[in-house]
Each structure stands twice: as C-alpha cells, then as structure tokens.
Regions:
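Glycoside hydrolase catalytic-domain context in secreted enzymes
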Residues: 1-98
Length: 98
C-alpha cells in the first residue's frame, strides 16, 4: 500500500484551538483531519492526544487540549466526533496520566 504524503493539511496546535472554546471549530478541525486521512487511504488515526499535561517538563503538552480535565474531555470529544464523521477511526492516546 502506498500513502501519498506529498500534500498535507496542517492545523494550528491543539491547545490553541481548544483555547477558543468553540465546539464547532473543534469539530470542523476533526472533520478536516479525518478527510485528509481518508483521502490518503488511512483507516485509523492515532489521535487525538488527550494527556492533560500535568507536568510542564513533559515536552509535548502542546499536542493536548490543555490541563483542565473537563475542557480536555470536551475538546477530545468534539475532535473524535469530527474525525469519525469523515470515515476514519480515532484512537485517543495518552488518556491516563500518572
């Protein structure tokens, strides 16, 4: 199987999108990511990343939806619904944080 990686859409960082606290934007971003995956022949995406970034030295906190568990949950929920509505299976990552 060959996956075309020549053209890719890039969104702003997840944490910045969640700071807008606009559910429709989170859902639309998920749809756009899902459509890109489907267009490239990908059935399952390893995302979104749901780590709440409790430890600042973690280094990848910008990938998540922020440190608030409720806001992170809503952000992930809307993103997953958007991705899956486009026909790709979402697989939330890093959900449990020690």
């Amino acid at each position: 199987m060959s996956i075309d990686t020549a053209l890719s859409w890039f969104s702003t960082q997840t944490i910045w999108v969640n700071c807008r606290w606009k559910r429709s934007l989170l859902r639309a971003r998920g749809v756009a990511m899902g459509k890109e995956h489907v267009g490239k022949g990908v059935n399952i995406t390893l995302g979104p990343m749901m780590n709440i970034g409790r430890a600042p030295q973690g280094g990848r906190n910008w990938e998540g939806f922020g440190p608030d568990p409720f806001l992170a949950g809503v952000g992930a929920y809307e993103t997953i619904l958007g991705m899956q509505s486009a026909g790709v299976q979402a697989c939330a990552k890093h959900y449990i944080n020690k």
